[in-house]
Regions:
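Internal intein/HINT superfamily modules and their associated LAGLIDADG
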Residues: 1-235
Length: 235
């Protein structure tokens, strides 16, 4: 990756579960995932184009704060001036998450894929009852303000031609990809999705919908082996 591609790549991680610490002249970056392959991909990608000091830690399943926690892997990049320069594009003056206009212009298809692997999910509505009535591709944006979420939606439309809608989950709002953009969205990110997260691209249609191209239908059939029991985000 060149420097622009690296910015776009990391921006996607930051829009998801990535975070930058509170250093002064240098800041560290970290991201966690229950998918080992996703963390390994990030490590390999960053090592191929940077001199970042990277470490990965495994945390076994455990009980704390009244909850059972799944095993996960955490990737950390040792404090670097690089992240100090990027910090204020992802945190406001009150240290709350947001996305600057510059950050929204940085993100790439690879970055969108990182964002989706980290904080995106597909829901097959009705699956537990045996009949899937609907499909929903969504980004969990609970940590962001309405203004930032709207800017993210605008970015997806203007830069990648991805139509979305805004949905409410409790007191938070999330981004839902419109059915008219399912195919464009999947084609945009599928080259970058790790095999163990390909289930997030599976729409679970038993018959080819009229709107779906033959190429996408064949791809969907190839994803069948990648389905997991959970429709939740694996990031």
């Amino acid at each position: 990756m060149n420097s622009s591609e690296l910015k776009g790549y990391l921006t996607g991680l930051m829009f998801g579960d990535g975070h930058i610490d509170k250093g002064v002249t240098k800041r560290a970056f970290a991201i966690k995932s229950i998918d080992k392959n996703f963390i390994s991909k990030i490590k390999n990608d960053l090592e191929s184009c940077t001199n970042f000091d990277i470490s990965v830690k495994y945390v076994s399943p455990h009980f704390s704060c009244g909850c059972n926690h799944k095993e996960y892997w955490e990737l950390r990049v040792k404090a670097s001036p690089y992240f100090n320069k990027k910090y204020h594009h992802f945190y406001d003056d009150y240290k709350k998450r947001y996305a600057s206009k510059e950050a929204l212009s940085w993100i790439t298809p690879n970055g969108i894929a990182n964002w989706y692997m980290s904080d995106g999910y597909i829901c097959h509505v009705g699956k537990t009852s045996g009949v899937i009535r609907d499909r929903r591709i969504e980004f969990c944006t609970d940590r962001y303000s309405m203004n930032t979420i709207c800017l993210m939606r605008d970015m997806l439309l203007k830069r990648f031609n991805i139509n979305t809608s805004l949905i409410k989950r409790g007191k938070f709002y999330r981004i839902r990809v419109s059915k008219s953009s399912y195919e464009d969205f999947i084609n945009l990110i599928r080259p970058f999705i790790v095999d163990t997260m390909r289930y997030k691209l599976y729409l679970a249609y038993e018959q080819q919908p009229e709107w779906m191209s033959d190429d996408m239908w064949n791809y969907q059939k190839s994803l069948l082996s990648a389905i997991t029991p959970s429709g939740k985000a694996g990031g």
